[in-house]
């Protein structure tokens, strides 16, 4: 994962000259190459098999080895790296330390940072969709005697990319609100 040091534009999350030339700004959510190590322990405190995803320097999710329920793993990460956690089978979103994104901080006195992965409180509708998806084959969704909008909801599977887009939009909106007088 070696890479050149971040320019001031990159560090600020703004497009740098290379990205502007290519006509594509860098993604809002991406890891920063701080080169400051952080020892982290991922603790799967959920009943699900967890897939850790590191958002690389280009904002692309990179899968790491799965964590079975009730297990943990020491990870050598860096300050400013972004991590998401998903159910390995369904890609349902999970929480880490009560939030959707985990960003390691610097270790204090050599102690590792704990990333406690838990289930969120899903809405009743979300949980019902999860259960129906687990019991019914996708080709049989439209055979169910339910309202049409639920067919579409069932077919709208959890997606890491959609979540990254949503989190990016939320980040931009919160920055915009902070800038207003």
UniProtKB/Swiss-Prot annotation:
What are the UniProt keywords, alphabetically?
Cell membrane, Cytoplasm, Endoplasmic reticulum, Membrane, Nucleus, Tumor suppressor, Ubl conjugation pathway
Protein name, per record? von Hippel-Lindau disease tumor suppressor
- Say which family it is in: Belongs to the VHL family.
Q: Which GO terms describe its cellular component?
A: cilium; Cul2-RING ubiquitin ligase complex; cytoplasm; endoplasmic reticulum; glutamatergic synapse; nucleolus; nucleoplasm; nucleus
Q: Which organism is it from?
A: Mus musculus
Q: How does it sit in the membrane?
A: Peripheral membrane protein
Note on domains (UniProt): The Elongin BC complex binding domain is also known as BC-box with the consensus [APST]-L-x(3)-C-x(3)-[AILV].
GO molecular function (one): ubiquitin-like ligase-substrate adaptor activity
What is its biological role? Involved in the ubiquitination and subsequent proteasomal degradation via the von Hippel-Lindau ubiquitination complex. Seems to act as a target recruitment subunit in the E3 ubiquitin ligase complex and recruits hydroxylated hypoxia-inducible factor (HIF) under normoxic conditions. Involved in transcriptional repression through interaction with HIF1A, HIF1AN and histone deacetylases. Ubiquitinates, in an oxygen-responsive manner, ADRB2. Acts as a negative regulator of mTORC1 by promoting ubiquitination and degradation of RPTOR.
Subunit relationships: Component of the VBC (VHL-Elongin BC-CUL2) complex; this complex acts as a ubiquitin-ligase E3 and directs proteasome-dependent degradation of targeted proteins. Interacts with CUL2; this interaction is dependent on the integrity of the trimeric VBC complex. Interacts (via the beta domain) with HIF1A (via the NTAD domain); this interaction mediates degradation of HIF1A in normoxia and, in hypoxia, prevents ubiquitination and degradation of HIF1A by mediating hypoxia-induced translocation to the nucleus, a process which requires a hypoxia-dependent regulatory signal.
Gene from which the chain derives? Vhl
Where are the stretches annotated Interaction with Elongin BC complex?
Answer: 123-132
Q: Where is this region: Disordered?
A: 1-30
Any one of the GO BP annotations: type B pancreatic cell differentiation
- Record's keyword annotation contains Cell membrane: yes
